[in-house]
């Protein structure tokens, strides 16, 4: 039996390109590709290839990606991740709420893991924000939403004058609420955990914030940071399984750091369908999971 997969994704790096090429060669799959930055719709006549798909897989890039998932929900079309799951991952505040609820529910199981202090705030009144932020420094200001790379930022505030730099650099965002995390002093490394079904992978790389603190570059291309394998522990595998179940995620990743004053891990970010850069031959696992998921529907 041949299953039709409607795959909405930008072919912008080798992992995705290899997954697509492998799915094209699979005798059990008919693959329809959609680029959310180029392929748009006549809304009263959505394509049959979408309506008749056995599975819709979306690697979210922009609002067009979200629109597809809304359409799928309205017409009860099968998706790898549904719109509610993706919207939760997109919204850092809602995701924070959900993660804290998970930590509370599994507090006896997740003793090895922490969440940093966090807040939502506004910089519409900069003086008021500075007064609020001063006793909490250092902090990291993050964009409220995370799927659109043109509207996404992580900004370290060590001293209160750094707020002025943020306001100058991101002045178009001052009327929006932002997500703020306590800055976690760590060993300078960032651990990235990737999950595909019941398979869990790990890499470690230099933390971009620590690169900035050391070198003060104008920009940091995180894709060029060297990555090494990280041995995934049973505690991390169990944590991954809990996140998958509670957040209804099949393919996802999360970032952790190791605070200097404890042997625990602090989770600082989570994404649906991440890049998987640095995992050898991961395209094989992704292809097999997506293919098998479609065949088992």
Task: Please tell me what each predicted stretch does.
Residues 8, 86-178:
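Active-site nucleotide/adenylate-binding loops and adjacent lid/helix of ATP-dependent enzymes
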Residues 139, 179, 201, 252, ...:
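Protein kinase-like catalytic core scaffold
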Residues 181-182, 191, 249-261:
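A short glycine-rich, hydrophobically flanked beta-strand micro-motif that places a catalytic Asp/Glu
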Residues 10-121:
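Conserved N-proximal alpha/beta basic substrate-recognition cap immediately N-terminal to
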